[in-house]
């Protein structure tokens, strides 16, 4: 069964308050070497038959990511 992994992340220039909160919590817990965290989403998509990566990119752009503030990366699963 074909599978794709799609990671959706905020674009680098978009403020990530959740990532900043996690980084602060890491330092509070004694992980002082943590200087930054970016929070994102991961989707594992299973298909009944093969599909071109361009089609999977359409799915990600139209349904999984907000193209104004997020970018996505696709890998075969």
PLM segments and residue spans:
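Non-catalytic terminal accessory/regulatory regions of metabolic enzymes
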Residues: 1-77
């Amino acid at each position: 069964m074909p599978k794709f992994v799609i990671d959706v992340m905020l674009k680098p220039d978009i403020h990530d308050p959740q990532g900043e909160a996690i980084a602060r919590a890491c330092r509070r817990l004694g992980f002082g070497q943590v200087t930054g965290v970016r929070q994102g989403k991961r989707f594992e998509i299973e298909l009944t038959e093969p599909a071109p990566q361009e089609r999977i990119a359409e799915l990600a752009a139209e349904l999984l990511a907000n193209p104004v503030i997020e970018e996505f990366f696709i890998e075969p699963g």
